[in-house]
Amino acid sequence: EGVEIISLPGHSFDMAGFRTKDDVVYLADCLSSRETLDKYRIGFIYDVGAYLQTLEMVKTMKAKVFVPSHAEPTEDITELAQYNIDTVMEIAEKIVEICQEPMCFEKILQKLFFAYELKMNFEQYVLVGSTLAP
């Protein structure tokens, strides 16, 4: 009692956040810190459309404090939510640019890693590859 469940689809399967009766909102993994986004650039997103809708919804939320899993607690989540949206849109534009000529999935992934100067390892291949896969 006193806890509101907030649906946060997109980043992973059926993710949820919680608002407590003292107006603290726990946002789970629905957004990342600027530092994380700047370092890794491309994270795992299960459903990009749903993820962007979730970020737009989060951007409009009001609470005493927001507690994301991958960022510092804050009283205003708007700027961080917008940064996450902007990062996703920038990457989407880069993917469209890369796909101007036909190529296989692995080549697209390679070009994306090269464009963002990322190091390919198994973990990154799985996370980023899962995000890019249709």
Residue ranges and their predicted role:
Residues 2-92:
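Metallo-beta-lactamase
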Residues 94-134:
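C-terminal regulatory/interaction regions
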